[in-house]
Amino acid sequence: LKTELNPQQTQAVEKTEGHVLVLAGAGSGKTRVLTERIAYLVRDKKVSPDRILAFTFTNKAAGEMRGRVARAVSGMGAPSWIGTFHATGLRILRREAKHIGFKNNFAIYDEVDVTSLVKDIMKKKGWKLDEYPPSAVRTRISRWKTGLVPPGEAFDKAVDRLEELYATVYGEYDRQLKKCNAFDFDDLIVRVVE
């Protein structure tokens, strides 16, 4: 496969010190470069496959990469940590959730579950759902989460009364998820940081 690589791609494959950033357009060979890099590390540099972590953005790309790497290192053992950010986060949380106060058999709330929980919290607080759209509250909670802003800090940093109200929902939302031993989709990445 290395014969199909251009000089810059070959350099990215063979660089073993420091980080490598591969930027290129669709169909330009990024997956081929990453696959060959992993194979090079396993075959030529004798890196144990279980010491390699590779992220992709889609399940399809992860499956393709796993297949390509398995063929490239045939018989040497392919890395088991090739997946999407969310799938990898889920895998880590299933093993380590106890360290952040959750059980390993946690539930994952989908958008329907999340919207229902936000609506329930808002109703209990006496909010009129036509005045405060639950989707707007959910979007704000997601932004806080992905920005690694915990509920208390979100309230403290609120710029107006509406944001304070959203932050109170966020705090209750977070408590309810923990009480139900559940994560939402954002948590599959965010909670791994904890």
Question: What name fits each language-model region?
Answer:
Residues 1-7, 30, 34, 43:
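Conserved RecA-like helicase ATPase core segment
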Residues 17-19, 39-193:
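A basic/glycine-biased coupling hinge at the interface between accessory DNA-binding modules
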